[in-house]
A protein has these predicted regions:
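N-terminal small-residue-enriched
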Residues: 1-359
Length: 359
């Protein structure tokens, strides 16, 4: 498909001519990937995958979605027709709507030409180097389950029947490793990964060091007694912890009564030292976005500030239901092209650090 914008305009015109509102997300990712395990090349791939997500809303608020991985005008129009056909089976709800955020910031600092232009042989060499360095880092590393390196170029196009058209282009590089340390009868698993906008920011030596330290530190480990401890969470553990907060902070879950935070807006929900920031346009983050996949412009805001819950994460639907404004937190992907509430670059702000713990 040579002119995606033209096809988006045609598909939205077809929806509008039926008297409906609609939106479309088009994702395309070109990637190169290599992985090694115990000295053997396990995977070497280069290719492109894509997906199209369609949402249609009737005048009485019924809505239906459809998706397709056929990147032709015919394939996209078939998805549109499928969504229109399904809409009669859904319930009326006047909170279903589309964005009218016309202006947006085109992000060009998330694209790295050298990362885009890396060939498959270079990617393979980096994956192999990652494995070799891990094996030589410590004699107790006996087994590398997987050393992987990948570079990708992603294109995103969004349009709707209000005439919006927004697009983004960005690169990513990622390195990861999983390995095992063995000493006598003891064994322990370690892993680490990095994701960035450019291959230059992937530090293979750091990945090796952190994964080996994790594996070796688990040898001859002991189970702690139950109690209250000061802890320092690794970046991976922190990300898993933050992931558990997205569900209760979702405006849809609040509206449906599924969140334990539903009556806590404006109240203290955490220690005063806790500030939780959503910062989707942070230039140093591995993934950034100036608009979400409903076309709402993103922004930087505190979800929790000094322990107080300031705002929920909203898409257009939940914002209308709760009398709020959309926060730009409706995201989709090439794997799931119709959006749901999520975050990009959600992280804690360190108000105070106990140096006596870290030292």
């Amino acid at each position: 498909m040579t002119n995606i914008k033209s096809v988006i305009e045609k598909s939205m015109k077809a929806i509008k001519n039926k008297g409906f509102k609609g939106q479309i997300n088009v994702f395309s990712t070109e990637s190169k990937n290599a992985s090694f395990s115990n000295g053997k090349l396990e995977q070497l791939t280069e290719g492109e995958k894509g997906a199209v997500g369609i949402k249609v809303i009737s005048p009485d608020g019924r809505t239906a979605t459809a998706s397709s991985n056929i990147f032709t005008e015919e394939g996209i129009m078939q998805a549109v027709e499928k969504a229109i056909e399904m809409i009669k089976y859904t319930e009326k709800d006047d909170a279903n709507d589309i964005s009218n955020d016309e202006e947006f910031t085109y992000i060009d600092w998330a694209f790295d030409t050298d990362t885009k232009d890396m060939d498959l042989h270079e990617v393979m060499n980096l994956a192999q180097e990652l494995e070799k360095k891990a094996k030589s880092e410590d004699e107790r590393i006996k087994f590398v389950r997987g050393a992987e390196y990948e570079v990708a170029l992603t294109r995103i196009h969004f349009g709707n029947t209000n005439g919006l058209y927004k697009n983004a282009l960005f690169t990513n590089a990622a390195g990861s490793i999983s390995l095992a340390a063995i000493e006598g009868e003891d064994s322990s698993f370690g892993f680490d990964y990095q994701l960035s906008q450019s291959y230059r920011l992937i530090d293979i030596d750091r990945i090796v060091k952190d994964s080996v330290e994790m594996a070796v530190s688990g040898l001859k480990s002991e189970v702690l007694s139950s109690g209250r401890y000061d802890i320092v969470m690794s970046p991976f553990a922190s990300s898993m912890f933050l992931g558990t907060l997205i569900t209760p902070l979702s405006g849809e879950n609040v509206y449906k009564g599924k969140s334990f935070l539903k009556d806590k807006l404006g109240e203290k929900v955490a220690n005063s030292s806790v500030t939780l920031l959503h910062d989707p346009m942070n230039g140093s983050a591995p993934i950034i976005a100036s608009f979400d996949n409903e076309g709402t412009n993103t922004s930087r805001f505190n979800v929790i500030e000094n322990g107080n819950l300031k705002v929920f994460l909203h898409n257009i639907y939940s914002a209308k239901k709760l009398g709020a404004k959309p926060t730009g937190n409706s995201f989709a992907s090439v794997e799931s092209p119709n959006p749901s509430i999520g975050t990009i670059n959600l992280h804690f702000i360190a108000n105070k650090t106990r140096k006596d713990i870290l030292n």
